[in-house]
Amino acid sequence: MGLNVVHLVGRVGGDPEVRYFESGSVKCRLTLAVNRPSKDDQPDWFNLEIWGKTAQVAADYVRKGTLLGIKGSLKFDRWQDRNTGVDRSSPIILVERMDILSSKRDTDPNAVPAGYVPEI
């Protein structure tokens, strides 16, 4: 029996990178910064990969600064470096569930409300 479950809560580091495939599949990649308990520590950065309907939700609603809660599993992308021939790998969290906990706009008092049109 094996167990590969990851739970993270953090802020998105940049707008999602979205790919649409001819098959109809949607893939979304983004980074998540998770703070450590001490204020002096730098956050840990995680690469997330999201597929399907959840990826489309991320594409439509997630932006840099959005607070997310995710549940997923750890996987490794593996490839061979074209220049050196060395085998490389990169850890990725394959997201199964994503909860949008707040947007950057929710915490920024100077942010313009959605749908705001200035009077001229």
UniProtKB/Swiss-Prot annotation:
UniProt KW DNA-binding keyword: yes
Keyword RNA-binding: no
InterPro entries: NA-bd_OB-fold (IPR012340), Primosome_PriB/ssb (IPR000424), ssDNA-bd (IPR011344)
Keyword line: DNA-binding
Ranges for domain SSB: 3-102
Domain of life, per lineage: Bacteria
Gene Ontology, cellular component aspect: nucleoid
MF terms (GO), sorted A to Z: single-stranded DNA binding
PANTHER family assigned to the protein according to its UniProt record, in alphabetical order: SINGLE-STRANDED DNA-BINDING PROTEIN, SINGLE-STRANDED DNA-BINDING PROTEIN, MITOCHONDRIAL
Name used for this protein in its record: Single-stranded DNA-binding protein
Organism in which the protein naturally occurs: Thermosynechococcus vestitus (strain NIES-2133 / IAM M-273 / BP-1)
